[in-house]
């Protein structure tokens, strides 16, 4: 199945005129900046209370940050748990959120009512991350050539100047729905139609990663909550040790990512009382149609080789010290020089020849899923204390997916090929039975049987085959997967 469900709640229309305005602020000790929160709501009824209107807007600007350390452990050949990697990270994030909602309801007469609702949310996340990684910490001692086996990486995450030299993640969601409730004699009817769209854009996301090999580290308090490496790493060390000991540009990448999902729904439900009394019964029936599409498009290029040929070590003139004073995990984590976000953002990558990172594009896909369903439910009173409900639901699912096959051979030569469209159709019948027995006002017994389904997640359905023979890794999707069926018995 594509995604899940997101319940975007709009403010309901009021019974009388209402107005409210809110304002708030706060302070983040990491970013050392103030936050701002604003909100405005207005609602009223018009035309002799037949038309209700509710409008609301809100705005939030929150410059925040975080101090972070992360550790990775593994079990060695002796069965011992050893640390293999340690990281210290400094984050600075500014989140700006805007929300707009509008709701209407119109009472045509006591038997007919219409509703219209809409909501739009827009969120910007500007993030910079500074990360030091100590790798291969389990490889102590010297290798066969007498060299130390550990390494360090220093990385800056950012973006272009038009995005504040930060990684921008722009998420937008919108949801518009139209519905009605109607009474035709004994027959009750409700219906609804809705359109929703969610997008995520991450333009010009950049990483500058520097690596130094042939290092040896001492780790203190390994296995505790806050272990740390006592050996400082610095971009100013290693330049005089020759080619084997110098810092190298391991990665200079820029990626552009677009993800969007569209969701279209129609539904109609009916309820008809058949007879009244202690043996009364009623019938409910309806239908629903859901059409979803989801697309992921990521393209990434690595400019590390082009940078080295053009600029060599120019980055050394554009450094910034991070891992702030007061770093919350502890003062044992020292400040380090990183490539500045301003320098990373200023690089004109359009003038460099980059190499496409095919692995990043191997996860691209187009997915379409249509589900048509219908149901009926029969409610029957079996005297004053027993009630029975019988139901049956039919769901017809039609899916179409396409993706990419990524292949890496033993020589690490890569290729990326489209999979073409893969389709799958199936129908599920889902019965349900429920009995309810009211022994008295304080004691009630329920027994039920239901058949339900759980569809595979969309990422498992993408018809991709990613083979990396150099690392002996294989990842496959299967568009022919069908839902998991469960039979549920309940007594309460």
Q: Residue spans of the language-model regions?
A:
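Hydrophobic, lipid-facing positions within transmembrane beta-strands of outer-membrane proteins
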Residues: 4, 36-40, 98-102, 172-178, ...
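Short loop/turn motifs that connect adjacent beta-strands in outer-membrane beta-barrel proteins
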Residues: 13-18, 47-51, 111, 186-188, ...
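N-terminal periplasmic accessory domains that precede
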Residues: 2-23, 36-40
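Outer-membrane beta-barrel signature, preferentially recognizing the C-terminal barrel domain
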Residues: 156-175, 359, 363-370, 424, ...
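Transmembrane beta-strands of outer-membrane beta-barrel proteins
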Residues: 17-21, 51-55, 114-116, 178, ...
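Flexible glycine-rich, low-complexity coil/linker segments exposed to the extracellular/periplasmic environment
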Residues: 146-158, 218-251, 302-363
């Amino acid at each position: 199945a594509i995604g899940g469900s997101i319940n975007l709640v709009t403010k309901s229309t009021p019974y009388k005129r209402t107005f409210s305005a809110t304002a708030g602020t706060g302070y983040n000790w990491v970013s050392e900046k103030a936050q701002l929160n604003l909100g405005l709501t207005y609602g009223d009824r018009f035309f002799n209370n037949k038309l209700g209107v509710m409008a609301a807007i809100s705005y939030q600007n929150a410059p925040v940050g975080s101090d972070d350390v992360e550790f990775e452990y593994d079990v060695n050949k002796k069965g011992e748990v050893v640390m293999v990697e340690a990281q210290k990270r400094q984050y600075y994030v500014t989140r700006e959120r805007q929300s707009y909602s509008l709701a209407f309801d119109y009472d045509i007469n006591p038997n007919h009512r219409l509703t219209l609702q809409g909501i739009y949310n827009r969120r910007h996340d500007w993030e910079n991350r500074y990360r030091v990684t100590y790798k291969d910490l389990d490889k102590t001692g010297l290798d066969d050539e007498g060299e130390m086996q550990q390494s360090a990486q220093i990385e800056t995450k950012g973006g272009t100047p038009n995005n504040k030299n930060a990684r921008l993640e722009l998420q937008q969601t919108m949801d518009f729905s139209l519905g009605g409730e109607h009474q035709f004699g004994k027959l009750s009817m409700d219906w609804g139609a809705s359109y929703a769209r969610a997008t995520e854009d991450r333009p010009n996301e950049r990483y500058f990663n520097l690596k130094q090999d042939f290092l040896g580290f001492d780790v203190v308090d390994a296995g505790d909550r806050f272990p740390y490496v006592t050996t400082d790493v610095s971009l100013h060390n290693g330049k005089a040790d020759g080619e084997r000991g110098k810092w190298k540009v391991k990665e200079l990448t820029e990626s552009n990512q677009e993800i969007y999902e569209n969701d279209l729904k129609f539904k109609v439900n009916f309820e008809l009382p058949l007879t009244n009394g202690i043996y009364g019964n009623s019938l409910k029936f309806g239908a629903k149609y859901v059409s979803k599409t989801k697309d992921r498009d990521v393209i990434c290029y690595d400019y590390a080789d082009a940078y080295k040929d053009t600029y060599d070590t120019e980055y050394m003139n554009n450094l910034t010290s991070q891992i702030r004073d007061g770093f919350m995990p502890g003062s044992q984590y020292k400040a380090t020089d990183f490539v500045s976000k301003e320098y990373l953002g200023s690089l004109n990558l359009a003038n460099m020849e980059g190499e496409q990172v095919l692995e990043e594009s191997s996860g691209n896909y187009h997915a379409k899923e249509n589900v048509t369903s219908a149901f009926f439910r029969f409610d029957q009173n079996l005297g004053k204390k027993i009630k029975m409900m019988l139901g049956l639901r039919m769901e017809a699912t039609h899916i179409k997916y396409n993706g990419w096959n990524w292949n890496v051979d033993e020589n690490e030569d890569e290729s990326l090929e489209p999979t073409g469209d893969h389709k799958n159709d199936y129908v599920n019948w889902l019965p349900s039975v429920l009995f309810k027995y009211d022994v008295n006002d304080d004691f009630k017994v329920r027994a039920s049987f239901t058949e339900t389904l759980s569809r595979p997640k969309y990422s498992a359905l993408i018809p991709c085959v990613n083979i990396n023979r150099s690392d002996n890794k294989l990842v496959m999707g299967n568009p022919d997967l069908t839902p998991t069926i469960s039979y549920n018995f309940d007594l309460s």
